[in-house]
Every structure is written in structure tokens, then in C-alpha cells.
Amino acid sequence: MASETELINVYGARVHNLKNIDVTIPRDSLTVITGLSGSGKSSLAFDTIFAEGQRRYIETFSAYARGFLGKLERPDVDKITGLSPVISIEQKTTNKNPRSTVGTTTEIYDFLRLLFARAGEAYSYITGEKMVKYTDEQILELILEKYIGKKIYILAPVVRNRKGHYKELFEQIRKKGYLNVRVDGDIREIIPGMKVDRYKNHNIEILVDKLVVSNKFADKLKASVRTAMKQGSGLILLQDVEADEVRHYSRSLMCPTTGLSYSEPAPHNFSFNSPQGACPRCKGLGDVDQVDIEKIIPNPDISISAGGIAPLGKEKSNMLFWQITAICEKYGVTLKTPIKDIPEEAIEEILYGTNERLKIKNESLGNSNYMVSYEGVTKYIEMQQDDEASATAQKWAGQYITTSVCPECNGQRLNKEALHFKINEKNIAELADMDIQTLFDWFSDSETEVTEKQRLIATEIKKEILSRLQFLLDVGLGYLSLSRASASLSGGESQRIRLATQIGSQLVNVLYILDEPSIGLHQRDNRKLIDSLKKLRDTGNSVVVVEHDKDMMLASDYIVDMGPFAGRKGGEVVFAGVPDEMLKRNTLTSNYLNGKLEIAVPKKRRKGNGKHLIIEGASGNNLKNVSVSLPLGTFTCITGVSGSGKSTLINETLQPILSQKFYRSLKDPLPYESISGIEDLDKVVSVDQSPIGRTPRSNPATYTGVFSDIRTLFTGMPEAKIRGYKPGRFSFNVKGGRCETCKGNGYKTIEMNFLPDVMVPCESCHGKRYNRETLEVRFKGKSIADVLDMTINVAVDFFENVPSILNKIKVLQEVGLGYIKLGQSSTTLSGGESQRVKLATELARTDTGNTMYVLDEPTTGLHFEDIRVLLGVLNKLVEKGNTVIVIEHNLDIIKCADHIVDLGPDGGEKGGYILATGTPEEIVKNKESYTALYLREELV
């Protein structure tokens, strides 16, 4: 047995459903905590071990500092020993900031900025010429070489393309002893009172010297160059008098032809989060909000009077329509003319306004005429988008706004200067747009070091970049690019990015706790992930992983299996030990691992109802103009390696098309050519893993709608009728029946000044949320608070004679959620639990049998047994005639599908093709498909 110093010991853990358990986890090992959904895995790993580690860390801060860090409750545990500093890496897309990218999160982009600031070569964004900079000595040598025997003017620029009369400047130059200046290309003698047109842009240079270049006058030439450099702030112009040719020379970066100069580059010049580097148009976001003319004029066949300009609606007697009438009259048309027949110039003025003042008639003032200005429909919409406009106005205007790629930087986020610094003909944005595998290859290629100077500067920076790119490749993220927005990443992707960042940090003696890092990862990349976790372990860290993946469990050093079931029937350690020992035990998990239990392959595949939904020419993101036919009335799985285009095809192309058709959704689908078969569907339902509510007041009862039925039931009780109670009396969200001390929360927040706030049960209602009078109304001896505290399993028996309630909660039980409480806060539900609450809600609804259900990785957070239950639910939906589309990597789900669409062959630019379609038995015959390779073993 290992010594105490080599163990993490947890004594008496009682958080959530944990049954006062003791657990021992070996340090410096890879430990998997597994078990059914709701068995207490996260309660042990995150809410006990991580929470205590975090609390101990915060305890080292001063009381003043702790006050800013929010509430950190002491977990309900007797003692934890052997705990290292803890870092939690959860499967949540935590960063919604549009400025955050894969590159900024991993800090690789910071190294790229440093590389370009130190080794980038500047080019003019006007001529494309390489920018140059000189010392005074280099300029002198260049003059003696290039201009020998020629007459030249040495000029010092003092005004560059600016307005003003410059009377005082000319006087100052004259007082310094200079006789001539060059103004806008012409040499002029300075005379007292001299000035230029103040409203025009001017270029003014001092004529410092004019001479015929000769080695004999080298000293005079040198003195003149230095003087000109001083007067021109590091910039001089040389004019070849005979050829009338001017060249620019500068101590800083400059285009020799145009005189365009750049400041000396620093890392912040390449940051889209810095004013010095960001594109001035989009402020570094890469896209801009613009009024979409197609949304303003959706149908040019109808007239303005009939509502042809969507934001204005049908003709009314108001200022906007009077102004538009005046424009129409000017072009000889009326408001009743179809928009397609109105001259383009008139439409242009209606949309974008006119500089002319319009003569309009005011009907309310006896048709009197007066002149007004007109700014256009688009300007009116933009004004409603302003920060000072009301939320309602902004929402109204938002439906006519489209986010499009910034026309100035083409989505590259940086200004023109930053984009014209290059290494090996690539600018920083082009490198950030490469997928990580391509970028790794580019840096690995010795040709990227184009000059000796760059090679010397770049060596150390390149080493850091390559090591971090390798970590991302190791966790299966080679298809992403550094420019990919963090907000667009899935939970699994963002978790693996943080994992790669942690591996790159080279920390030791840390306890890492991860939540299902294999989510979103194809079987092909699973081994890389396991190796990465072992690398983290081998550098001297302890790694605890909450995981259901079979390969991860068998590759671990130690397994803690929670169970035996979920909710109140879980919370115990049913096994703790090495994987080989676990295979010999008789637990639900071990029986799936050793083959005693398995999810069976269906004996036959459904053919569907003979109808198909066909989408053609899908080309969004990395899709290669693909077409796919989805059989209706079947369970279809969309498969492929990470980044192959699954979500692009279903979530970003197909689903928005259907949502626009059925719900008038404002979200536009990615590009596609055509879709057919949509008439055979009635609706589309997306069942994702986002929370069912974001406040503690939301719960399964409120989400499914059964709480309304329960409140109606209590309203019908004799006591409630006598007192005249309405359903609102039994709501904890409104005044009347709720406890007003805690406002229906059930707890009170105590402010502790500089210490964290503490949440304590309400002293009036003792956590029941309702006042005494409301709790006196009972059904079968139970109050409304008692009902909310029931688990679904208990509630099913309790309401067995109330069909309106039973039908809704019975479905929650059928999807495997019998262990959760009716009134359990939505904030405590896992992603998998939230998804099954949504599924149950859909199952309880009366459907026409023509619904398409779309699920994205529904197995997230699910144990083998949970997956078996989920498959039963999905099959029930299909048996009613509906269509189920699932994006999934889990082979237990894939092998049970009626139809598979496999994308690939790889991720990123190497993906986006449809490799195979058909039944699982047909898919496994494909030689190019990675999915087929692993699926073959499951079908044996």
C-alpha cells in the first residue's frame, strides 16, 4: 500500500447525493471516476475535491482580496488530505468574447506577434515594394553611388498631405536661414507673408541644399543630409533635377517610391485587440453589422404602398412616407408602382438618402408645402441599432441587419500596416487562418527562415510555437485554426484547448480534474488524448478524469466507480482499484467493460417511409459542395472525424433552413444550392445540451410544463377553494403564496463584507419557498413544497391517478431521470440531464409523426446504461414516424443507426467530403473512412 504522502484521501464526503463516502486516489497517477449519470461522479470530483482545493487556495489571500472572489462554500466533507493545488478543466465553452480565439487562448498568437515584430519584413500597402530604412551613412553612400555627377535637391519634409495656410511655418523656415521651399512639387522662394490655400491638402519640404554630387563635396553632402534628417524628423527627399524623379529615404520603415512610412513594429502592432493593430473599420472583430437590402426589400414585385419596404410596412400618413412620395414624384413614379419598376436612382435615394432638400406636403396642415432633409431608410434602421435606443427598438432593427465580413480587412481583423509585414511571403493573419497541422508543417519547413537575420531572431520563438502546436495536435485539434473564435468551439474542443495549454505550461505537482475530455473526439484521436493525459501525469502531476469512455478507463492507472445507480440510489463507491481488478467485479460499469452486458446491434434496419430530405450543393465552411439525401422516418447518424464538417452540414446549414421554413427564424443557413422534401416535415426540434434555465428558479417541473398542472390540481383542493386561491398562489415566482422573506428562493444570501457571501436556508420557510397558509393546502397529505421535493420515481407513484400530470412525468422516468427531483434547480443539472429533460418534454407532446429531431452528441455525460436508455427513447420517436438526426462519435449509437452519413476523410481543409452513406453494414466496406475502421469491430 502506498504511503500517506502518495495518496489523496477523502473522508466523509456528503455533497449532493454522496453517502458519507471515503475515497483514496493515488497521487501522480491517471485516475478515472466513472458511473451512471447522476451517480455522484461530478459531486466527488468537482464539488468536493476541486471545491476544497480552490477554497484552500483562496484562504491564503487577504480578507480584502477574498471579498472580490465571490462565494466559495466549504464542501460538506469531513477531511481531505494529500491535496495538491487543483486546476479544473471542464467541458464548457466559457469564453463568449468575440475577441477570444484559439490563438489568444493558447498564447500561440502572442508568440506570432513577437515573431513578426522582430523578424517580419515590411512591404508597402500602396505599391507592394519592400519597405526600407537607412542610417545617415547608408544614405550618403547611396547618393554617392546612384547620383554621382547629377544635380540633386536635398529636401526635408515638414508638412505631409495636410490642410492649412502655413503662414507662420514659412516665416519660421525663413528665420532659420532657408531661402526656398518645395510646395506641392514646385520650388518656390520664401517671401514675407507667404501662405497657401488653407482648404487644400499640401506637401511642403524645405530645400536644404542643391548641388552636383561629387566625391569632392562628400563632407558638405554629409552635413546637408544630417541637417535635412533633423529638419524632416528622420525623413529626407532627394530630387533628381534633370529626371524630375523624387525618392524618399528614412531612418524608419518607408516605401522609397511613395514615401509611405510605418512606425517601428512592436508586438501590439499585430494585436487585433490593440488600437495600434486593429482594423479601424471593424475594430478588430473581423466582421461588421450592415443593413441587409434583401431583408428591407424582400419582394420587389410589390409596391411601396403595399408594404414593399419591409421595415415601413404598408402606406401610412407619416413623415417617412411623405418624404418617399416626394422622391417618387421626382422620378415620375408613385408609391403604387411595383418596386422593380422604380428607377434605380430613386431606390438608391429612398434607401440611402439624398443631399437635396425635399419638398413635401403635410396633409395635417392643409397640404401646406415645406422643405425637409432626408437621410434614408437604412440610416433610420441604424439609428434604432444605436446603444442609446431601447431594447425593443434594437431588436426590431436587428431583423434587418446582417453580420458580414469586414470589407476593409476581409475578416483578417488587422489594419493594412500589420497585414503587410511578411515572413516567407505570409502575413500573420494568413498563418492564423491555416489549420494547425498545416501551420505546424509550415514552421517545421526550414524554408520559413528566409534570411540569416530572421533565422537567428526566430529560433527560440519558433521552438515555443512548434511545441504548443504539437500539444494541440496531440489532443486531436489539428483541424482548427488559430483564428477560430473561442465562442464557436464545442465544449469538448474548448476543454482540449485548455488541456493543451496546461501541458504547455509545464507545471508540476498539480492535481488536474477534467470533465469528459473525449467528448467530440473521434475514436481515431482517442489514443492521442490518452497519451496527452499520461504526458501530464509523467511530468509529475495527478490527473483525475470524469469519463465514460471504455478506452480511457482501461488505459488508466486507477478507477473509482460510483453507483450503484443514480440520484438517491447512487452516491456510493462500488469499486476503487486498478482496471484489471475491475474487470473481475460485478458492477454495472464492469459488466459493460468485460462484455457481460452490451448494447445489442439491431436485428434489422428501418428503411423509412420512402421519402427523403435532399440538400444539394452545401458549401459552408469546409464543405466541398456536397449533396446528401436523408431518409425520413429513420434514425440517421452523421459521423466523421472531428472537424470533418458534421456540425456545418446539420447545425449550420440544414437546421437553419428548416427553422426559417417552420418558425421564420432570422438565422441564415450557410451556402447551399437547393433543398427538396421539406414539404414532408411539419417541424424541426433541436435537442441540445444547453441548460433548461439559467437561474435557480428554473427546474424540470417548470420546463416540462407539469408545474402548471400541479398548481391547477392544488387550486382544486377544498381548502384552496374555500380560501379562493388561484393557480398563481402556488407559484414561488410571484407575490401571494410565496415566502416574502426569501422571495420564493428558499434561501437567503448573507453579505459578509470582505468575506464571501453565505447562502443560508430561509428562517421563515426553512427552504420550502412558500408561506404557511399556502403550505396548509394539501393533496394526499402532501403540500406543494413536498411535491417539488419528490424524485420523479416517487412522483410517478404519487400522481398515478392524475393523467394530466402522470403523462408528463412518466416520460421523465422513461428517459432515465427518475432520480432527479421535480423542483431540482436547473443550474445543478448536467448537460446530459438537461438534454434528456428536453427530450422528455418533446416525447410528452402530441406529435404528427412528421417531426425532425436534431441532436448534437447526445451521449455527452452518459454511461453505457444511460446510452441504452437514450437509444430506447430515440427509437420510440422514430417508431411514431418521426425522423431523428444525431451527430455522434459514440460507436454504441452509430452501430444502432438505420442510416449513416460519414464525412471526411480528415478534419479542416482535408475534410468536407461525404465518404459514404448507407446502413452500418454498408459503411464498414468503405476503405477511406476512419469511422468504418472502428465500426467494423463493433459489428463483428
Segments from the language model and where they lie:
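Conserved phosphate-binding elements of NTP-dependent enzyme cores
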Residues: 1-940
